[in-house]
Amino acid sequence: MKAMLNPSKSDCITILSAASELPDGKLLSLDCRSLGLSRNGMDTAARFLIERACFKRYSEGDGHYAVGSLSLQGRLRLDQLANG
């Protein structure tokens, strides 16, 4: 049984906001220091958002994540988290 991911709202907003500025076809390598997040917080939020199809593309390897521009689901989730 998978553990439930419970990321912080602010960690999700930080990752979604960074990805929202990407042009299609580009990937953003997630780095906790440049995003101002803890490693654990960033990993939890990234997995949560990837599982919910918030990005058009993503890659994962050796404990590192890279995400592409936001999918429609990602844009809706960012709006929901930021405004609601």
Where do the model's predicted regions map?
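A short beta-turn/loop motif at secondary-structure boundaries
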Residues: 34, 61-62
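Short, amphipathic alpha-helical interaction segments positioned at domain boundaries
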Residues: 69-84
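Non-catalytic, well-ordered alpha-helical scaffold segments
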Residues: 9-13, 43, 72
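Small side chains
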Residues: 19, 45-46, 68, 74
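Minor-groove-contacting beta-hairpin "wing" of winged helix-turn-helix DNA-binding domains
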Residues: 62-70
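Beta-hairpin "wing" of winged helix-turn-helix
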Residues: 54-60
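Short amphipathic alpha-helical interface segments
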Residues: 4-35
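Short amphipathic alpha-helical interaction segments
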Residues: 6, 36-52, 65
